Structures are given as C-alpha cells and as structure tokens.
Amino acid sequence: MNEEIDYQAMLHVALEEARSGLAEGGIPIGAALFNKNGTLLGRGHNRRVQENDPSVHGETDAFRKAGRQRRYQDTIMVTTLAPCWYCSGLIVQFRIGKVVVGESRTFRGGIDWL
C-alpha cells in the first residue's frame, strides 16, 4: 500500500459520516472505503435507528455504496469506531487490505481478529 496516503483526510470523511448519522438522530459511527491510491469508493454511516435495521452499520453502508469491486485486497476501510464482529467478518470475508480505526478504547469489537 502507498505510504503517501493521507489517512487523516480519510478519517475526516468517516467523521463527516458520523456527524450525519448523529444529525439524523442515529448512532454516530461513520466509515468509508477507499482504493489503494486513496480514491473514495463509498462512504456511509450507521443507520440502525433511522432504517430500523440492525444490519446497517457504518462499514456495511460504505461497503454497499462502494458497489461491487473487482478485488478488495487493495482497498482501505476507514471507520470512526472499531468494527464489531459483524463488520469485522465482512472485512475478513472480502479480504479488505487495510483497516484504519479512529477509536478503539471504548469499544474493541472484532479488532483483535483483524
């Protein structure tokens, strides 16, 4: 992976999504999926409350909005909070190459599995 990538800028996209979720009355967790060069593929936020759907987490929302990719090994998932086991499973299943986590002290989720 390219070490010239601005991970802070990527995290800023995820933070914008978290703020959107909070403004909608939902859980403020955001995520974004980028290609290996830092190009945004998809962004999303937790919509469990808004859609009354327990499966719409920030990571799954960003993943879905990115659309089908040829391969995921060269992608980067950026999330404001450590992925839960469900989202960690998605990351492992599709072999997403790198995960950038904004915060993992209050919730560790499946981070040790990644």
Placement of each model-derived feature along the sequence:
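Short, basic/aromatic recognition patches
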Residues: 2-24
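Residue-level signal for beta-strand positions within conserved beta-sheet cores that form or flank
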Residues: 4, 27, 73
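Glycine-centered short loops/turns at secondary-structure junctions
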Residues: 25-26, 95
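Zn2+-dependent cytidine deaminase-like catalytic core
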Residues: 42-114
